Amino acid sequence: MHRYLLFGQDARAEKAVMANAGWYTFLKDINYPYGVKDMPISEDRLKWFLSVKGAIMLGDEDTDPNDGSLRNDKGAKEQGNNRFQRGIRYFERNVLIADSLDMPFRWRLQVVKNAAHENSKMIQAAAPFLLEDT
């Protein structure tokens, strides 16, 4: 979801849930897919991306570094050992970027208790966020 928001051609989303991604595209000067070096992202798009009402949702038990669906190449491992670590680092990095641009940051970090890489638990956690007023 975060890559769609960052690189997509429309700006209609009012809210977005980004849950348990295996790796992230950081707003750093490193090559895609782990960064945005040489990628066509306008300043307006970057500001819109950071101002969307978003939620990074992470299962507190999604910590298996050997999960079969977890990307484990060098670029991914530099983000953290597991989905939980990677998500926290991605959120924290975006907080710093929004602060450096002196702009509002409307994302939240939500840790889902007793959840590993389980879609059903993430959907239950996402529903209240998606249904609340923007």
Which residues does each PLM region occupy?
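Short glycine-enriched nucleophile-adjacent loop
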Residues: 1-9, 124-127
